[in-house]
Curated annotation (Swiss-Prot):
Retention of enzymatic activity was limited to the N-terminal fragment (AA 1-196). GO terms for molecular function: N-acetylmuramoyl-L-alanine amidase activity. It comes from Bacillus sp. It is an enzyme of class 3 (hydrolase). Residues 1-37 form the signal peptide. The keyword Secreted applies. It catalyses: Hydrolyzes the link between N-acetylmuramoyl residues and L-amino acid residues in certain cell-wall glycopeptides. GO terms for cellular component: extracellular region. This is N-acetylmuramoyl-L-alanine amidase CwlA. InterPro entries: Amidase/PGRP_sf, Amidase_C, Amidase_domain, NAMLAA_amidase_2. Belongs to the N-acetylmuramoyl-L-alanine amidase 2 family. Keywords: Antimicrobial, Bacteriolytic enzyme, Cell wall biogenesis/degradation, Competence, Hydrolase, Secreted, Signal, Sporulation. The gene is cwlA.
Length: 251
């Protein structure tokens, strides 16, 4: 996903990002409002409190406002805390009311965080919530819905997928991994099933992800790399029980 640069003026660095930084971690947040990314960027650029973060992600775009080689004040763990001094802060928009816009913002954040993990060689163990930094109840919507681990799994799976894709492009060869070469792609289904579906896939150990929200509001498409054998029957039986239609592909 493209990260649009709209950096704050250098004159604001002394307040918003006074220290140089070599990012080794990532912290993700919910904004707790229903404003788009551009509003979040502008609020930080003009505030006098010093509160800041690196990227705001909504359902349409990701905007970077602080350079990745500067710190930002988003983690609440003090002047020398790892969150404030060593992590890239990612704010996910539209979390107050939720709905389709928020779900899409979440999926966009997965893409952004996965890209950052690869760019800065950050392992998933260093991708943390605001709550893990200083105890604040954030990201509030993910915590309310019990989906923090699901979100982290999505980031890890997406980063792995991008790495494998890059490796294939570099070598010019298609690498076939035993037990992971068949994909199953669902047709469109409602967002209400997303946490349950991906939770089930995670429990079975599959690499899976949402691939599209489709043309209809609130409808998504999903793919997973299935292993062959008895586990395949368990997963497809679950899809069948939910009345979800799917097809197999090796592409």
């Amino acid at each position: 996903m493209e990260i649009k640069q709209m950096l704050v003026p250098v004159s604001r660095y002394s307040v918003l990002c006074p220290y140089e930084m070599n990012p080794t971690e990532i912290t993700f947040h919910n904004t707790y409002n229903d404003a788009p990314a551009i509003n979040e960027r502008n609020n930080v650029a003009n505030n006098s409190t010093g509160t800041s973060f690196h990227i705001a992600v909504d359902d349409k775009e990701a905007i970077q406002l602080i350079p990745f080689n500067r710190n930002a004040w988003h983690a609440g763990d003090g002047t020398n805390g790892r969150g404030n001094r060593h992590s890239i802060g990612v704010e996910i928009c539209y979390s107050q009311s939720g709905g389709a816009r928020y779900r899409k913002a979440e999926l966009n954040a997965v893409e952004v965080i996965a890209q950052l993990m690869i760019q800065f060689d950050i392992p998933i163990s260093k991708v943390k919530t605001h709550q893990e930094r200083n105890g604040k109840y954030c990201p509030h919507r993910m915590l309310d819905e019990g989906r923090v681990q699901w979100f982290k799994n999505q980031c890890a799976n997406r980063a792995s997928s991008i790495k494998n894709s890059n490796k294939t492009q570099e070598t010019g060869k298609v690498e076939i991994i035993v037990n992971k070469f068949n994909k199953v792609v669902t047709y469109e289904f409602g967002t209400a099933l997303v946490p349950e579906m991906l939770g089930m896939m995670d429990a079975l150990g599959y690499e899976s992800r949402i691939i599209s929200y489709g043309d209809k509001q609130g409808l998504v498409r999903f793919e997973t790399a299935y292993r062959q054998g008895n586990e395949l029957d368990k997963a497809t039986a679950w899809l069948d029980a939910k009345g979800l239609k799917y097809f197999y592909t090796k592409e």
